[in-house]
Amino acid sequence: GLARTLFSWTLHAIVYFWLFPAYIALYTLVPKAAGGRVFSDQMGRVAFIMLLVFSVPIGFHHLYMDPFQAAGWKFLHMTGTFMVAVPTLLTGFTVIASLEVAGRLRGGKGLFGWIGALDWKNPLVLAALLAMLMLTFGGFGGMINASYAMNTMVHNTQWVTGHFHLIFGGTTVIMYFAVAYYLWPKMTGKELFSTGLANAQLWLWFIGMLVLTLPWHLIGITGQPRRISSTPYDESLVQQWGTSELIMVVGGLILFISALMLVYVLFRTHGNSQAVANPEVEYAESLHSTPRMPHLMNSYGFWVAMVVVYMIARSEEHTSELQS
């Protein structure tokens, strides 16, 4: 029980440290690259604070079926897991609204005309739109994982693996790729080798991730375990997994080709003789005026201290739980 407790509590929180940089790029780089502004600076700040507070103590939703965890702690972590959906929805709303502002400024008309007016040739804009789609699918799976009742159907199955690959390998990593395409030319002083090839790489990653993770969810629903020492491969249920696993192999190959394309574009960019037109990193500004924040609230040291105190408190809480 101790190993599973520490594993679920620590490693689930760690994935949010990978997600945070992707969110930062969505708020600070994407609106400017799209030609607009951040729809709400305050909403972004609230989303980050909520995500920080609720993302740390929620790992026990992987242990709903574990007999070593008390029901009260499971309920607490279930509540925290559902609360993570709030900053996620705030982020999705703010980013999409920021893109709509950019689309309207570029001449987009009608209810959805702003989507077509966006600069789809810009890797940052394209990646943000694809990331939002994968975050939508992955977020839906996360709500099922959070539910104490529905979790019983997917507990310790490949559904869980498909879910976090769609969020991390999809939403997070595709934003990392786009940021690399944005920052690498500014760091090297060389113009991006091929915007078209960069966009093709992003599309391939999006397609490959869906081809990989959707069958992963399916075989999870049909009962393929996430961790098991042995499997009776002669049963008819196990034989039904073959087609989905073959499709997943195709998805993995697509992702591999996409990753090679990323390396190729960055390598050719490094050797490009054409200098980058604008070497400065441009950050997005808020659409609405931002009220002055107390100096303490903008202090990096203050928030580091808050996180340390918070994590120590959570450690003491889990220690007392294990002792009881």
Write out the residue ranges for each language-model feature.
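Membrane-interface helix termini and inter-helical loops of multi-pass transporters
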Residues: D66-A70, M150-H155
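Histidine/acidic residue-rich metal-binding segments in metalloenzymes
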Residues: W114-L124
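C-terminal amphipathic alpha-helical interaction region
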Residues: L287-M297
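Juxtamembrane inter-helical linkers in multi-pass membrane proteins
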Residues: G1-A3, R104-I115, Q274-H288
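Hydrophobic cores of alpha-helical transmembrane segments in multi-pass integral membrane proteins
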Residues: L2-A34, D41-Y64, H77-G103, P123-Y148, ...
